[in-house]
UniProtKB/Swiss-Prot annotation:
Family matches, as Pfam families: SH3_1, UIM, VHS
Low complexity composition bias: residue spans: 442-458
Source species, domain of life: Eukaryota
Descriptive protein name: Class E vacuolar protein-sorting machinery protein HSE1
High-level lineage: Eukaryota, Fungi, Dikarya, Ascomycota, Saccharomycotina
Gene name as annotated: HSE1
UniProt xrefs under PANTHER family: JAK PATHWAY SIGNAL TRANSDUCTION ADAPTOR MOLECULE (PTHR45929:SF3)
């Protein structure tokens, strides 16, 4: 969408003008929320002031201003409390609004949106008797202008499980195309209001079959769909969206329901008869778009600069202006508005998608590192608990470790030498025989000299090699 001029003025009038700027081709919810917050910060004063400004904006002849103002009125009516609801539901505010439905010069799109505003606020206000003028306005539109309320919105299909029988991708694609075409044919009265649709020659079932016969291996994959109708759902797992929204397809959930995500990050299931497939562009189409973009930036932009320079010179009183040249140049550059608008919308949408992707990536990255830190902390605590239960390594009499060998017991040497029956440990049965004296005949590794100086008497070594080793001179 086009971006409105950024302003640092935080006054209510500036915020409303920014949210309803004529350069906005779609609703900017950041601007709308800013207006709602401003009104809620001082409802006693800001409510009446906002209504006065909105009434002035509704007198504009620009369709973009009117459409953005209608969306702002809905947001204020549903989010800014009872004072705002009383003002919006007053006859003084509703009467000029409903009169616009009779204006012949007003675009059909604006009239449909006015009727939708009255209908939506009627549903929101009908439980409050003090807001009855809104219900009266809705009933009046139903009687006098029913065509603006008769939108052929399809019923949501039942949620049937996907059949166990395998279906080819082409059959699934064909069924989606048929559903989309049927819904477009039903929406006769608002065809002119729809966004540009794919060429029917390319998407009709007959031509789809021909394409299948010509090239079976070229099967387009549906990764995105575009909403054809508004869907406001209160079901927990269903996705709510507006007409024209792009939905990224995630997976097939039911036969006629898929799961998808909006550019805002919302995820849910949606019915197939509310959307139309969006196909990936071919390499030729991408190349053609790049050529058009390069031509606009490198060639046509110079013409625009030249027209601006000539107009500036004419404004300053320069009479040496070639009117014919200026007229020709203006005719050439004025036709570029639609192409420039398309490029702005394309790159703005891409910017939104990339920003959202970056935010989601940051959230997932933080969640991953939090999980990793928690795992490391848990592992460290477990190791600390285990190490606290390990028996300390035996030490000598002076408290130092005896180079990997057990030290000679001092006061409690008999405790390690005899068992409870008075039998020496060296004489106890083992898997290799009786006692440990078998090791006495095998050469032992030479211990450090300080260990040999602490050896017990020789007669004690004859039956126990647990706590003593032979001296080097005797081996």
């Amino acid at each position: 969408m086009y971006k409105a001029k950024k302003t640092t003025d935080s006054s209510l009038e500036s915020l409303i003008k920014r949210a309803t700027d004529e350069t906005l081709t779609t609703n900017n919810w950041e601007y709308i929320i800013a207006v709602c917050d401003k009104v809620k910060s001082d409802p006693e004063v800001a409510t009446k002031k906002a209504i006065t400004i909105l009434t002035t904006r509704l007198q504009s002849k620009d369709a973009n201003v009117l459409l953005r103002t209608l969306s702002l009125i809905i947001a204020l009516g549903e989010n800014c409390g009872s004072r705002m609801q009383q003002e919006i539901a007053s006859e003084a505010f509703l009467k000029p609004l409903t009169k616009k439905l009779k204006e012949k010069k007003l675009h059909e799109t604006v009239k449909v949106e006015i009727a939708k505003l009255i209908e939506q606020l009627h549903q929101s206000f009908k439980s409050d008797p003090s807001l009855k003028p809104m219900s009266d306005a809705y009933n009046k539109i139903k009687q006098e202008h029913p065509r603006y309320l008769e939108r052929n919105v399809p019923a949501k299909p039942e949620k049937h499980d996907v059949s166990s029988k395998t279906q080819s991708e082409e059959d699934e694609l064909q069924r989606v195309i048929n559903l989309s075409l049927q819904e477009y044919e039903r929406e006769q009265f608002s065809k002119s209001l729809q966004k540009p649709l794919p060429d029917p020659k390319k998407t009709s079932p007959r031509n789809a079959n021909i394409a299948q016969e010509d090239s079976d291996d070229k099967k387009p994959e549906i990764s995105k769909v575009r909403a054809m109708f508004d869907l406001v759902s209160h079901e927990k797992d269903e996705l709510s969206f507006r007409k024209g929204d792009l939905i990224n397809v995630i997976e097939v959930v039911y036969r006629d329901w898929w799961r998808g995500s909006l550019p805002t990050g919302e995820v849910g299931i949606f019915p197939l008869n509310y959307v139309a497939p969006v196909y990936a562009k071919s390499s030729d189409q991408i190349e053609k778009e790049l050529q058009i973009e390069n031509r606009l930036l490198n060639v046509e932009s110079k013409k625009i600069d030249k027209v601006l320079a000539m107009l500036s010179a004419a404004t300053n009183g320069n009479e040496n202006i070639d009117d014919e040249e200026l007229e020709n140049l203006y005719g050439q550059v004025s036709g570029l508005r639609s192409q420039l608008g398309h490029l702005i919308m394309k790159h703005t949408q891409r910017e939104k998608e990339l920003k959202l992707l970056n935010e989601q990536l940051a959230i997932e990255d933080k969640a991953f590192h939090d999980l990793l830190d928690k795992s490391i902390s848990s592992f460290s605590n477990r190791n600390s608990y285990i190490s606290s239960d390990v028996v300390p390594y035996p030490t000598g009499g002076n408290g130092s470790v005896n180079s990997g060998y057990p030290a000679v017991p001092n006061a409690y040497s008999g405790y390690n030498t005899y068992n409870g029956n008075g039998t020496p440990l060296a004489m106890q049965p083992t898997s290799l025989g009786f006692g440990n004296s078998i090791y006495a005949s095998q050469p032992q590794q030479q211990p450090p000299r300080q260990v040999s100086q602490q050896m017990p008497p020789q007669d004690y070594q004859s039956y126990s090699n647990i706590n003593s080793f032979p001296e080097v001179d005797r081996m």
